[in-house]
């Protein structure tokens, strides 16, 4: 017989975070602000993808970006040069954002007059997938050089995302062991409802379809 108590800390943390995330999601819905949580590994092209996306949409809607990093404000500076509002969130060593940190950023930012807010999460394929940020939709970027086996190695990330961008398709000829068919099959096996776009943030390939997806989702959300 045990003479001590076992506390499931991880379960409690997730339960508390999920409740906070649901509350934040409801608040954003009442404001009509669509929050996209954008995730990837470091170097997959989040910021470059975001800059091209902003250039395509900023004349149609009011956009804001929250940049999350352990340190530095390089990405926030790059985004601010596009002309949209941007803030930098330093996570203090944390490898992800949770709902409370997202709420703090939202408060500082002020989103009531924004249609579309992108949260560029910390570059990591593990921790960000575990914590609900309160976002409307989750998106991730997988770059061709990372390999088509990433859905097998990081299944949770691919399971929780509404949309997956396969980036750097302009160098597919160099990485000829990357199979578009295999990566698509592996993603859909984990997540049959996921939308998948093959894109290049460098050339713009696939960005018309990606931008149309954003327009459609925001339109449905704000009705």
Regions found by a protein language model. Name each.
Residues 3-26, 31-39, 44, 48, ...:
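Nucleotide-state-sensitive switch-loop elements of NTP-binding domains
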Residues 68, 143-144, 201:
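Cofactor-binding loop segments of dinucleotide-utilizing enzymes, especially the Rossmann-like FAD-
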Residues 72-76, 150-154, 179-186:
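Short, glycine/polar-rich helix-capping loops at beta-to-alpha or helix-loop-helix junctions
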Residues 88-91, 142, 167:
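Short beta->alpha connector loops at strand-helix junctions that form conserved
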Residues 96, 124-127, 134-152, 162, ...:
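Conserved Switch II/interswitch segment of TRAFAC-class P-loop GTPases
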Residues 156-158, 165:
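Phosphate-binding/switch region of NTP-binding enzymes
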Residues 172-223:
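Canonical P-loop GTPase G-domain recognition
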């Amino acid at each position: 017989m045990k003479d001590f108590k076992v506390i499931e800390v991880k379960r409690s943390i997730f339960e508390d975070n999920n409740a906070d995330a649901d509350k934040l999601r409801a608040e954003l819905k009442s404001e009509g602000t669509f929050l996209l949580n954008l995730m990837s590994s470091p170097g997959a092209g989040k910021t470059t993808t975001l800059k091209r996306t902003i250039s395509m949409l900023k004349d149609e809607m009011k956009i804001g970006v929250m940049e999350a990093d352990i340190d530095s404000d390089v990405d926030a500076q790059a985004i601010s040069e596009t002309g949209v509002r941007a803030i930098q969130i330093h996570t203090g060593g944390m490898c992800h954002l949770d709902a409370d940190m997202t709420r703090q950023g939202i408060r500082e930012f002020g989103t009531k007059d924004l249609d579309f807010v992108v949260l560029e999460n910390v570059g990591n394929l593990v921790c960000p997938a575990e914590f609900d940020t309160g976002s409307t939709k989750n998106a991730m970027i997988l770059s061709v050089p990372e390999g088509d086996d990433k859905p097998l190695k990081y299944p949770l990330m691919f399971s929780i995302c509404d949309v997956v961008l396969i980036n750097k398709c302009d160098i597919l000829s160099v990485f000829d062991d990357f199979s578009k068919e295999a990566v698509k099959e592996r993603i859909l096996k984990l997540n049959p409802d996921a939308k998948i776009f093959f894109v290049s943030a460098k050339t713009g390939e696939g960005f018309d379809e990606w931008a149309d997806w954003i327009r459609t989702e925001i339109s449905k959300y704000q009705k």
